Amino acid sequence: RRSSDLGKGKDIKDEPLTAKVTRSIILLDTIPYRPRLMDSRIGIFPTMKNEYSAAKQTTRSIYYANRWRLEPSDLRGYIEGKKVTPIKPIVFYVDSCFPESWKASIFEAVNQWNEPFEKIGFTQAIQAKEFPKDDPEFDPDNLKYSCIRYAPIGIENAMGPSWVDPRSGEILNASVYLYHNVIKLLNNWLFIQTAQADKRVRHKVIPREVMDDALRYVV
């Protein structure tokens, strides 16, 4: 293929390529988090394990629920029904490269998740923070840090990969990637799915407050 085919969605063969790759390795806790069996009626991601037994000729698949390690800082108060902070809150670091008009919606989207966490007894369980500017150890490519990243390319989508402890299903990292043209996707969704009921989206330019709410939904 010619070099001019690059970026046009075509297969490229016999062309030189340079790729920068980050390898991130973390040490798991000696004692894994207590696993919880997945309930297929609840829409969460599972981790599968195969159980081998000398008493059976075949393996049995076990599915653990992928979940964060949220442990109460005040166990006694938690048992008594008080709302407590977790020992280790869930922290998402927000990319400083996002368009300014997106940032408020992203922070609000993360903080809104504190509402369901409060119903199970945790306050300040999840936090959104800006990329640290004065921490030389911070690296958004390090699995130690869950991040919400800005991808300045023309894909109309967002994605949220996660990495878990295979022994228990404990979520170790869950980063979110927002591609720049996710806004175009939201415009299409809003018009096609809601225009019949919402006259605000029956325009070429959808009002800012409607788009902000849609962006919170995606995050």
What function would you assign to each model-found segment?
Residues R1-F98, P116, I120, F131-V218:
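Auxiliary tRNA-acceptor-end handling modules of aminoacyl-tRNA synthetases
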Residues C97-A125:
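Zn2+-dependent metallopeptidase catalytic core
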Residues I106-V110, A214-V219:
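Extended, hydrophobic alpha-helical segments in both membrane/secreted and soluble proteins
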